[in-house]
UniProtKB/Swiss-Prot annotation:
Gene label: mb
Name this protein carries in UniProt: Myoglobin
Binding site for nitrite: H60
Any one Gene Ontology BP term: removal of superoxide radicals
Catalytic activity: Fe(III)-heme b-[protein] + nitric oxide + H2O = Fe(II)-heme b-[protein] + nitrite + 2 H(+); H2O2 + AH2 = A + 2 H2O
Function (record text): Monomeric heme protein which primary function is to store oxygen and facilitate its diffusion within muscle tissues. Reversibly binds oxygen through a pentacoordinated heme iron and enables its timely and efficient release as needed during periods of heightened demand. Depending on the oxidative conditions of tissues and cells, and in addition to its ability to bind oxygen, it also has a nitrite reductase activity whereby it regulates the production of bioactive nitric oxide.
SUBUNIT field: Monomeric.
Provenance organism: Heterodontus portusjacksoni
Globin domain: residues covered: 2-143
N-acetylthreonine carried by residues: T2
Length: 149
C-alpha cells in the first residue's frame, strides 16, 4: 500500500465524524498557536474557551476537512484541488503558507488522540509524509504567486 492508500484507509473512518474532528483541530490550532486565531476575523475576538460550541467554527472545520479529504482522495494527483485551495488562501484570505504546516501537524495529533487504534506510529508517519507533500505543493504555488504575507 502507498502512503496515500494508508491515509485514505483511516480517512474513511474519520469522515463520518468530520464536524467533531474539524472543530477539535481548529480549537487545538488556536490553543497551541494563538496567533492563528487572528487570521480568522469572525473568531478573532472570541476567547478560545467560548469557541467549543460555536456553530460557525464547527462549519468552518467541516469546510477545512472536506477540502482536505478531497485532496487526500486524489492520492497525489491533487494539483487542481491544491491550486483552488492556494488561490483562495492567497487572494481572498491572505493566509501565509506556514499555517498549512501548523494545521496539518495539529491534525496528526488530534487524529491520533481521537482514533488511537487506527493512527498507529506507521500511520502517523504516512499522514505526516502526505501532509508534507501537500504543504510543499502549496508553498510552490505561493512562491509562483509572489505571495507577500
Amino acid at each position: 500500500m502507498t502512503e496515500w492508500e494508508h491515509v485514505n484507509k483511516v480517512w474513511a473512518v474519520v469522515e463520518p465524524d468530520i464536524p467533531a474532528v474539524g472543530l477539535a483541530i481548529l480549537l487545538r490550532l488556536f490553543k497551541e498557536h494563538k496567533e492563528t486565531k487572528d487570521l480568522f476575523p469572525k473568531f478573532k475576538e472570541i476567547p478560545v474557551q467560548q469557541l467549543g460550541n460555536n456553530e460557525d467554527l464547527r462549519k468552518h472545520g467541516v469546510t477545512v476537512l472536506r477540502a482536505l479529504g478531497n485532496i487526500l482522495k486524489q492520492k497525489g494527483k491533487h494539483s487542481t484541488n491544491v491550486k483552488e485551495l492556494a488561490d483562495t488562501h492567497i487572494n481572498k484570505h491572505k493566509i501565509p503558507p506556514k499555517n498549512f504546516v501548523l494545521i496539518t501537524n495539529i491534525a496528526v495529533k488530534v487524529l491520533t488522540e481521537m482514533y488511537p487504534s487506527d493512527m498507529t506510529g506507521p500511520m502517523q508517519e504516512s499522514f505526516s509524509k502526505v501532509f508534507t507533500v501537500i504543504c510543499s505543493d502549496l508553498e510552490t504555488l505561493y512562491k509562483e504567486a509572489n505571495f507577500q504575507g
